[in-house]
Amino acid sequence: MARKKKVEDEVKELEEFEELDVEESLSSSDKQSKPEKKISALEDLPGVGPATAEKLREAGYDTIEAIAVASPLELKEIAGISEGAALKIIQAAREAANIGTFMRADEYMKRRTTIGKISTGSKALDKLLGGGIETQAITEVFGEFGSGKCFAKDTKVYYENDTLVHFESIEDMYHKYASLGREVPFDNGYAVPLETVSVYTFDPKTGEVKRTKASYIYREKVEKLAEIRLSNGYLLRITLLHPVLVFRNGLQWVPAGMIKPGDLIVGIRSVPANAATIEESEAYFLGLFVAEGTSNPLSITTGSEELKDFIVSFIEDHDGYTPTVEVRRGLYRILFRKKTAEWLGELATSNASTKVVPERVLNAGESAIAAFLAGYLDGDGYLTESIVELVTKSRELADGLVFLLKRLGITPRISQKTIEGSVYYRIYITGEDRKTFEKVLEKSRIKPGEMNEGGVGRYPPALGKFLGKLYSEFRLPKRDNETAYHILTRSRNVWFTEKTLSRIEEYFREALEKLSEARKALEMGDKPELPFPWTAITKYGFTDRQVANYRTRGLPKRPELKEKVVSALLKEIERLEGVAKLALETIELARRLEFHEVSSVEVVDYNDWVYDLVIPETHNFIAPNGLVLHNTQLAHTLAVMVQKPPEEGGLGGSVIWIDTENTFRPERIKQIAENRGLDPEETLKNIYVARAFNSNHQMLLVEKAEEIIKEKAESDRPVKLLVVDSLMAHFRAEYVGRGTLAERQQKLAKHLADLHRLADLYDIAVFVTNQVQAKPDAFFGDPTRPVGGHILAHSATLRVYLRKGKAGKRVARLIDSPHLPEGEAVFRITEKGVED
């Protein structure tokens, strides 16, 4: 059987060669009488008929160039022809496409004169790049980790050195590690390498919080800061370029300078940390001492006999002596000896203004933290059925108490009050957090154990509107007597509770069940009960009259028409399953978050040091909110400039933008277009944007981009710029560790080859942004490098390094080019985008 097949293949190949030879001999004999046929379509290739051409097109080989760069084995499998016939076809395609031939250097130079160049908006930067961003090339841009995205010096951070939790200002942290003698000058500031420091980082897409390494701590001086005050009393003091995670129709990173009152800044509901062991009785005693203890004499004063008995008993067990108890006017003062002072440490000499949360409590588990807070509440807290209030004169202690509450998943409110010249910090807990606080009340010795439920919800109206927009895609039963239904279907500007969110979650689960039932009915050939209007399938080519008929009478009888209707309904079911799953994922994510409304935003004079932690893996750390470094200003400017006519530095073309980190901002495009003399609405219409959610999706979008490029090729606005921002984000997130490096680089090489092919075949400019990572062995010079390794380094035609310069300027350095010398250019970011 195998021999028979082999003979058949040989006969088939021989026939194909004979057919090709006949064509060649005929064309040879007729050369003098007939002009040589020009190959412009697949059917013009020798041995390619309509059926073979259709197979090739279905597989994506729809141009002469695509055939020319294919392998014989690929065509053999796709078209069902022999390898020899495939080779003949490829050779003909290469001759027609002029691929695989050599030319003299002077001819090649003439060909390069056809390369287009897009102005960056800056003459200095254009000169550095040899006239602008070139077509038929990949230009890579990456930036430093400082870039003006930092925190004010008094910003509190928490981190772990090995396994020990530290809680201090970012300035104190910097000086602690700089004192080890490893500070290095970097650009306009300084950087200190970190070896054993870990922080917790947040993935906005999944809601996952994980422990990760910090590589450097960096500082520089700035003149201005943004002060963002939140409705719960929190104050963020950060540089204007610093991205802040907000909820705007979904999670987005927005520069601090673009935050407005009413925006919702997103934080983490429960802050994680490594936990050490501490006895609950010790934690409770420390809470009492921080609340009511004094240093001179070293003692605790209380009016509660129960608390007095606990303190005496604890000291007897812990320190081996019975403390002296003085009774004055109904108050008990318990006096401690030197042995107690020794283990209390600095707390034994502190006063009301200098007290802090002890380090052993910062490192404790949730149960011990609850015991400490219970001790503090019993000592100096205020509690009713509807509110919890903790007051202190110490700013450090207030910050520490907030941190401990966040460890338990409680987000308190903060306010300040000045009494007789002294500032007091008031921390209070209301709303749904009161229920969570009951885990503290369980440890209390003198306070009641239950609080009222309900109150103001923790979920904002913006979340309800976002979910309501998704819910409007369905047609489900009305529920006018339910709050959840009103949140989704009416414009109600109210915060809602966990109970309401859970009911909304049930609606979307019901939608998924009904979609599944409809799918099963269609597969059985029955008329389905749809959880969406029948009119939804008009988008698939059906008329309103047809849809009305199907809704009334059921699926059509004619098999071919029935198949089309079923196919359209299944497509709509699949789409709506994605909508319902997005809603459920959003709900699950919202449960891990806190939403803080912005009360005010003010730009203030600062003229001091700002600091930043460098987290190479994820570019953000928890408390304060995240940090993600982007190099998108130049990309936005190019997306506008490419649309200008050639005499004004453009190519009169359209743009494709693949967005991997949700950084494309149409508002910025409109601003640049207006200031460059272009119609902002028309400018937006010429930009095609797609969000990539993983590396496979990113690579698929490059294939889809080719379809748009072909479609627009003969129009008055052909695609001339393809932006990928950023190139490596998904590859880094999905391929973690050395064990996956080879697979990642192989996949990246394929991705870059596809981008190069688009640039060459269609004469477009490919512009990619990249991230940086720390070089752990760098003690001098630039302590960062772009990610992507040698694969990206050798694939990018030009590589440009961006850094922050003086007086708000930016510096671009050309570090790799096949034909241009290294050099630098200085430019600014303004309303026009990039300019001199």
From Swiss-Prot:
GO biological process: DNA repair; intein-mediated protein splicing; intron homing
Domain (DOD-type homing endonuclease) ranges: 285-410
Protein name: DNA repair and recombination protein RadA
Composition-biased stretches (Basic and acidic residues): 31-41
GO MF annotations in UniProt: ATP binding; ATP-dependent DNA damage sensor activity; damaged DNA binding; endonuclease activity
Other remarks in the entry: The intein interrupts the ATP-binding site.
UniProt similarity note: Belongs to the eukaryotic RecA-like protein family.
Pfam families according to UniProt: HHH_5 (PF14520), Intein_splicing (PF14890), LAGLIDADG_3 (PF14528), Rad51 (PF08423)
Keywords: ATP-binding, Autocatalytic cleavage, DNA damage, DNA recombination, DNA-binding, Endonuclease, Hydrolase, Intron homing, Nuclease, Nucleotide-binding, Protein splicing
Post-translational modification: This protein undergoes a protein self splicing that involves a post-translational excision of the intervening region (intein) followed by peptide ligation.
InterPro entries on file: DNA_recomb/repair_Rad51_C, DNA_recomb/repair_RadA, DNA_repair_Rad51/TF_NusA_a-hlx, Hint_dom_C, Hint_dom_N, Hint_dom_sf, Hlx-hairpin-Hlx_DNA-bd_motif, Homing_endonucl
Composition-biased stretches (Acidic residues): 15-24
Role, per record: Involved in DNA repair and in homologous recombination. Binds and assemble on single-stranded DNA to form a nucleoprotein filament. Hydrolyzes ATP in a ssDNA-dependent manner and promotes DNA strand exchange between homologous DNA molecules.
Region of interest: Disordered: 15-41
SUPFAM superfamilies named among the record's database cross-references: Hedgehog/intein (Hint) domain, Homing endonucleases, P-loop containing nucleoside triphosphate hydrolases, Rad51 N-terminal domain-like
Encoding gene per record: radA
